[in-house]
Amino acid sequence: VYMWDGQFAKAAEYARKAIDKSGATPMSESQWHNPTTGFNTATSAWMWYLHPTASNMGNLANFIGHISNEADWGYASLSKLQMARSLYDAIPATDFRKYSYLDPDRSTYAYQSVRGNAWLDEQPDYMSLKFRPVGGDYNTYSVGAAADIPVMRVEEMYLIEAEAVGAS
């Protein structure tokens, strides 16, 4: 709210407090790109998350089914969520987060998917691989969809702090 209200000094102050008090650390590249736990299992970077279980899971009523292109249930596998080329091209090659999206030249990065390389080769350019089914289980929604859902990550606090300091 402080950012929204233009109270940048307060925004920076409280972002820093959240970073310091949480003890959270940013995700590593290996955590980010892990094909079985990437963005489905809470890490030390996650300050706040939801933890649904298999017992309250439906094949369409779940986060992973709407956001993971690797999952065979839900809508994501049908819509093939992608990033716009102009945005992809704006991300530096040195930023490992860029490779959460399929580069037109698949040899640019050693993409990992539990679905295998043949499946990856068939997918559209710029398709997202950021969110993964739990344990890599893309067939069984009650297993693969029982994923932790990130609500607030420490990386967001660093971005708020940087933006607030820059705007002060």
Question: Where on the chain are the PLM-derived regions?
Answer:
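Elongated scaffold/linker segments in the mid-to-C-terminal portions of large proteins
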Residues: 17-167
